[in-house]
Amino acid sequence: MELFPVAVNGVSHAEDPFSGPLTFIAPWNYKVLATLMFVVTAASLSENFAVMLVTFRFTQLRKPLNYIIVNLSLADFLVSLTGGTISFLTNYHGYFFLGKWACVLEGFAVTYFGIVALWSLAVLAFERFFVICRPLGNIRLRGKHAALGLLFVWTFSFIWTIPPVLGWSSYTVSKIGTTCEPNWYSGNFHDHTFIIAFFITCFILPLGVIVVCYCKLIKKLRKVSNTHGRLGNARKPERQVTRMVVVMIVAFMVAWTPYAAFSIVVTAHPSIHLDPRLAAAPAFFSKTAAVYNPVIYVFMNKQFRKCLVQLLRCRDVTIIEGNINQTSERQGMTNESHTGEMSTIASRIPKDGSIPEKTQEHPGERRSLAHIPIPENKVCPM
């Protein structure tokens, strides 16, 4: 099977897409795309580099539950470094000037790192479910468990992104001619089987994990809130986490649903005529996830923000770490910290995962969940 047939992605290329721009697309369209990719890539690289740098500098952030957060930032950083940078350059030139094999490598790298980031979100959801709901009783999330999660993410993603390089489907130039992607437009049944399998394992399955884990987590929080009082403050952790979960799921859907829907529609109807500029939109949406993932999953964590601010002020890291150690208990008890709220709830759930019966207490003795000392897991971005 030829990697690049005469007709590439449904566009008849008497003009080689690797030798010059498509003549029926005005040059200014490519300049607009280049500008957008420059903004997205610059923002993503700076944000995700900040996440990795701060985690490296502050030992308080190097906790098992944060391993997958850093992994997400690494994957997003690599997506932007490879796909974002190359997309900016190729759109600036108006065509994929790097050649056929560079197209294969770029298509593989962007798809691989993108799926690593996507599955990192699913593993993060599972780990939060594991910590809060305690499905295995008193077994805690430790470094070896987090490391196994990372190994799964990178291995599973590689298994489902290497086949096009080896002949099961292919990586080819996109319809607009400036990026490379899996060959959605192939009419070959052999290629269709890969697209369907890829759609199930790299979109439906992780989305299912995310939805199920967060729904069970919210259900557990609701039970805890109902058990420990009817005061507004007792409901606050549940409301905060519910809002955060909604944001996470919506962000996931915004980033990946257009790309998944596009791949299925084009696979089902290979001869469909789409404007190349419209066909480029789903891939652009998926790349923007690298910008808002750090905001949702990292920058909204109070302790991380404090470390980042201190680092930007160029203060001595040793002094900063000492200050954080001295105030960690107070941070855990603050109402503003998602970390404290999640750890508080986890500490109130019995080791067997059951919900204790309500006990009679005097009005003056009733306390909010947010004011209970936190014994562990103080760094738990939520």
Curated annotation (Swiss-Prot):
Residue stretches of biased makeup (Basic and acidic residues): 349-368
SUPFAM superfamilies from the UniProt entry: Family A G protein-coupled receptor-like (SSF81321)
Modified residues (N6-(retinylidene)lysine): 287
Membrane topology annotation: Multi-pass membrane protein
UniProt-annotated location(s): Membrane
One GO-annotated biological process of the protein: phototransduction
GO molecular function: G protein-coupled receptor activity; photoreceptor activity
Cytoplasmic side: 57-67, 125-147, 215-244, 301-382
InterPro entries in the cross-refs: GPCR_opsins, GPCR_Rhodpsn, GPCR_Rhodpsn_7TM, Opsin_pineal, Retinal_BS
GO CC terms: membrane
Pfam families from the UniProt entry: 7tm_1
Disulphide-bridged cysteine pairs: 103-180
Keyword list, A-Z: Chromophore, Disulfide bond, G-protein coupled receptor, Membrane, Photoreceptor protein, Receptor, Retinal protein, Sensory transduction, Transducer, Transmembrane, Transmembrane helix
Disordered: annotated span: 330-371
PROSITE patterns, per the entry: G_PROTEIN_RECEP_F1_1, G_PROTEIN_RECEP_F1_2, OPSIN
Topological region Extracellular: 1-35, 89-103, 169-193, 266-279
Record's compositionally biased regions (Polar residues): 330-346
UniProt tissue specificity: Expressed in a subset of retinal horizontal cells as well as in retinal ganglion cells.
Transmembrane domains' residue ranges: 36-56, 68-88, 104-124, 148-168, 194-214, 245-265, 280-300
Protein family according to the UniProt entry: Belongs to the G-protein coupled receptor 1 family. Opsin subfamily.
Protein name: Opsin-VA
Organism: Rutilus rutilus (Roach)
